[in-house]
Amino acid sequence: MEDLKLTIRDIPDFPKKGIIFKDITTLLQDAKSFTRMIDMIANRYIGQRIDKVVGVEARGFLIGAALAYRLGAGVVLVRKPGKLPSETFSKTYDLEYGTDTLEIHKDAIKPGEKILIADDLLATGGTMAAVVDMVTNMQGEIVECCFMTELTFLDGRKKLPEGKVYSLMQF
């Protein structure tokens, strides 16, 4: 695991001064590291009959699609407003300064489907809590919310269903 962590570079003062940004593009660019990361996460869910993997815009699309392929599941996209072509459900949620909104196609999840929600990073948990609400309202059965990385000092998992959070790497 430590070798995977070493493929993620720190970018100081991005996106603003005082922040150390965990840049996952270096891991994604390395075929062996990317494959290993996806396999390590996917192995947790093999045999659980996941119906769909929900990928959260934008880096969650990369991880979600790769996991869905490995698990033989469909892919559902959660996007910013106005990006999905058919009828959507939307969820507005609070940010540190303001609000944001996410959308999902109304017909993307059927009641009782087993859903894995995937994103690259668990930080404050606000975005994922909004996605959990949407999937729950659509009567999807959330297997887990999975992340490639987690910033544990931000306590994001406190906003998510207890026992339904998995992160491969913690910082």
From Swiss-Prot:
Predominant localisation class: cytoplasm
Record's catalysed reaction(s): AMP + diphosphate = 5-phospho-alpha-D-ribose 1-diphosphate + adenine
Subunit composition and interactions: Homodimer.
PANTHER family: ADENINE PHOSPHORIBOSYLTRANSFERASE
GO biological process: adenine salvage; AMP salvage; purine ribonucleoside salvage
CDD domains found in the cross-reference section: PRTases_typeI
Similarity remark: Belongs to the purine/pyrimidine phosphoribosyltransferase family.
UniProt function note: Catalyzes a salvage reaction resulting in the formation of AMP, that is energically less costly than de novo synthesis.
Pathway(s) where this gene product acts: Purine metabolism; AMP biosynthesis via salvage pathway; AMP from adenine: step 1/1
SUPFAM superfamilies membership: PRTase-like (SSF53271)
Classification via NCBIfam families: apt, PRK02304.1-3, PRK02304.1-5
Organism expressing this protein natively: Trichlorobacter lovleyi (strain ATCC BAA-1151 / DSM 17278 / SZ)
An example Gene Ontology molecular-function term: adenine phosphoribosyltransferase activity
Example of a GO cellular component annotation carried by this entry: cytoplasm
UniProt enzyme class: transferase
Protein name per Swiss-Prot or TrEMBL: Adenine phosphoribosyltransferase
Signal peptide start and end residues: none
Cellular location(s): Cytoplasm
EC number in record: 2.4.2.7
Keywords: Cytoplasm, Glycosyltransferase, Purine salvage, Transferase
